[in-house]
Amino acid sequence: MTRLPTRFTFLLAVCVFLSACGKTPEEQLLQATGSQALLPLHEKFLAESLNLAQSTSAFCAQRSRSSTDLAALRNRWVGAMNGWEGIQSIQFGPVIEDNQSWKVQFWPDRKNLIARKTEQFVKGDEAITLPALQEASVVIQGLSAMEYLLYDKPAEKLLSDEGQPYCDHLSTAATNLHQVADFLYQRWHPKGGNYLGTWQSPGPDNLAYPDKNAAIGALIETLVYGLERIKRDKLERPLGLSNAGQANPFLLEWWRSKQSREAILINLHSLQLLYSAGDGAGLEELLRHRDKEELSQKVTALFDRAISATASIEGSLSENHREAANRSAINTLHQTLGELLAAFKREIPATLGITLGFNANDGD
């Protein structure tokens, strides 16, 4: 029997394991980004939403609730919020169907609709049920309404006898959130709706992605959208970094729970994951394949700088954004986001021969 050389056997095993041999760099990008970034990020949101739904149900079933119980439930909410922030920037696939993102988060809330509509729903004549919630405004259906219930005036009522209607809303919203997370995950999963397969298999018979550039372009547009949203909506407008210069901390994301900085940090980590595909052959590797090692390294360094600047911000953005040290970090973050946007809007598409859609260039 002929024995294969050890080196060849090893390489063959690697090829079978990675299912990458024979694939073009673009195909490898789609495979790696899907399996190592898109699907795991949705799976994390699903898991965290389930933890929150189960914990909320247990919390509201208690005859008496303590501040310790409330603190533990808040931690579960933070976990679900973190899971959502991981996929918040994605602008293709199931999340854009039927206002799924609005069902999870209503923000920015310029008119305090979350508080007003939540109070109306809780104090209304209709029983607080899942169908009633799902037929009501998206403002009160997801994480944003839950944040109000857990961190604003209703939080005290949750610990008293009069708090049951608020707890009913809290528990129902958590169940609804889990249903949305499950819908998103199942629609992506190969054994469900398999949108992952749709994105990973561009071609003339694929109406959504007729060629590889269309599929990769959707990924780049997501990166542009996510970076632009951090820069404009999470920094410039609430902190007065735009031309007007007037800060309004109530426009910050998650200002009630003081999770604004943490949300940005998770955004950046997930966007970097979408760029690199972790250890896989992501967009970062494709640039190297196109002899753009310098550009690839520059973008990686910019992500690292943005993450470092965000992590160095002390305290909450709503209360401490004017402190000198924090202002310096915020300015560094703001500048770095601008450099990242320039790379993803112009340099990378030009290198890959990809034309981005109108929305990805909005704000130029």
Task: Report residues per predicted region.
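C-terminal motif of bacterial Sec signal peptides marking the signal peptidase cleavage site
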Residues: 18-20
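Mature extracytoplasmic or organellar-lumen-exposed domains after removal of signal/transit peptides
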Residues: 24-364
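Bacterial N-terminal signal peptides that target proteins for export
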Residues: 1-10
